[in-house]
From Swiss-Prot:
Pfam families: Ribosomal_L32p
Gene Ontology biological process: translation
Keyword entries, A-Z: Ribonucleoprotein, Ribosomal protein
Keyword Ribonucleoprotein: yes
GO terms, molecular function: structural constituent of ribosome
HAMAP family in the cross-refs: Ribosomal_bL32
InterPro entries: Ribosomal_bL32, Ribosomal_bL32_bact, Ribosomal_zn-bd
Organism this protein belongs to: Streptococcus agalactiae serotype V (strain ATCC BAA-611 / 2603 V/R)
Any one GO CC term of the record: large ribosomal subunit
Name of the protein described by the UniProt record: Large ribosomal subunit protein bL32
Listed SUPFAM superfamilies: Zn-binding ribosomal proteins
Length: 60
C-alpha cells in the first residue's frame, strides 16, 4: 500500500480544515406576509415576489 511521503503535523492539518465552515442562510423580510423567508424561494404562505403562486399547507 502507498504511504505518505511526509507526516502531516496537527498544525498543518488544522490549518487546512479552518475553511470548513457553515454559512448562515440568507433571509429576507417579506412585506406581503410579514414573515421572514429565504431569498429566491416560495414563502410558507405560498407567496413569491409578492404574488400568490401556491396554496399554503394549513395546520389543523
Amino acid at each position: 500500500m502507498a504511504k505518505p511521503a511526509r507526516h502531516t503535523s496537527k498544525a498543518k492539518r488544522n490549518k487546512r480544515r479552518t475553511h470548513y465552515k457553515l454559512t448562515a442562510p440568507s433571509v429576507q423580510f417579506d412585506e406581503t406576509t410579514g414573515d421572514y423567508s429565504r431569498s429566491h424561494r416560495v414563502s410558507l404562505k405560498g407567496y413569491y415576489k409578492g404574488r400568490k403562486i401556491a396554496k399554503a399547507n394549513e395546520a389543523k
